[in-house]
Every structure is written in C-alpha cells, then in structure tokens.
Design a protein with these regions (language model features):
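Compositionally biased, intrinsically disordered low-complexity segments enriched in polar/Pro/Gly
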Residues: 1-7, 61, 66-68, 106-109, ...
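Small/polar-rich, solvent-exposed N-terminal microdomains that initiate assembly or binding
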Residues: 1-62, 85-86
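Hydrophobic beta-strand residues in large extracellular and virion-surface proteins
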Residues: 12, 16-20, 31-33, 48-50, ...
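Short, surface-exposed loop and linker segments with low hydrophobicity and enrichment for Pro/Ser/Thr
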Residues: 41-43, 64-70, 111-116
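Short, surface-exposed linear patches
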Residues: 55-57, 70-74, 96-101
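"Short basic amphipathic alpha-helical interaction patches in structured regions
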Residues: 64-65, 89-94
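Oligomerization/assembly interface segments of phage tail-like spikes and tubes
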Residues: 67-82, 117-130
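Acidic-leaning, charged glycine-interspersed low-complexity segments
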Residues: 92-134
C-alpha cells in the first residue's frame, strides 16, 4: 500500500510524454515524439525527444512517508533538417505546451551540425500529488 501512494511520481514522466505527444502531433504533421534517445534505422525529422532528467521532493510532511509534491525537470531536444525558422516554430509549440501547464522554461539553446539543427530547453515546475495536468 505504501508503495502505491508514491507511484504517481514515477508515472509522471509518462503522463507528460503522452500529453506532449498528442499536442505536438496536432501542431506539426509528421513529427516523431519519443522518450528513447536511441532508435534503430533511418533518422526521422523532425524529432522531439523528452527526458525527465530528475525530480526533487517538495512539500514534505512531518511523517515523510508520502510524497506530497515533486519538482521534475524535463529536457526537450528537437532535431530537424532544414531552415532555422522551422525548428524555431517547432520549439515554440513545445514551449507553449509547457507554459500552458505552468512550467518554468529555461536554457534554450539552438545549434547546427552537419545540416541537422537542434533546439534544446528545459522545463520544470512543482506538481502536487493530486493535481491534474490535462
């Protein structure tokens, strides 16, 4: 029973992934949204990789056996071939998604290497155990 009380913290990454995938696929035709940083076969462009790079516990009570809230940090990496404006448009959609869910967005970086453009940023917020992102 105690394990079930805190399982939401481990499921949260998948919840955000599913919501982001639906949102991005409605905004950008043909985008691949994934949690896996490795894939077999030919690369697909554009691709959005979402990874939860950690979380800290927040809102501890005196007994400390139940996780009341967490502050997860997600790193979003978008890759695309083509014009800089296109990857910026895709990044703006992704940032808009996170802002609509009350995340703080930081560390936006744009790079290019061998004709592949990359946009990376992080998103973080405190989320309570009984909050609903949808």
């Amino acid at each position: 029973m105690e394990n079930e009380l805190n399982s939401w913290t481990l499921d949260f990454e998948d919840t955000v992934y599913r919501l982001l995938k639906v949102y991005m696929e409605s905004k950008e035709s043909g985008i691949k949204v994934t949690q896996d940083d490795e894939s077999n076969g030919t690369p697909v462009f554009p691709t959005l990789l979402i990874q939860q790079i950690g979380f800290t516990e927040a809102g501890r009570d005196t007994e400390s056996y139940f996780i009341n809230a967490i502050r997860p940090t997600f790193q979003i990496t978008i890759t695309n071939k083509g014009k800089r404006e296109k990857i910026k448009d895709i990044a703006e959609y992704a940032v808009s998604f996170f802002k609509s869910k009350n995340f703080d967005v930081s560390n936006a970086v744009f790079t290019v290497s061998k004709q592949v453009r990359t946009a990376t940023f992080r998103a973080s917020r405190i989320i309570g155990a009984y909050e609903n992102l949808a």
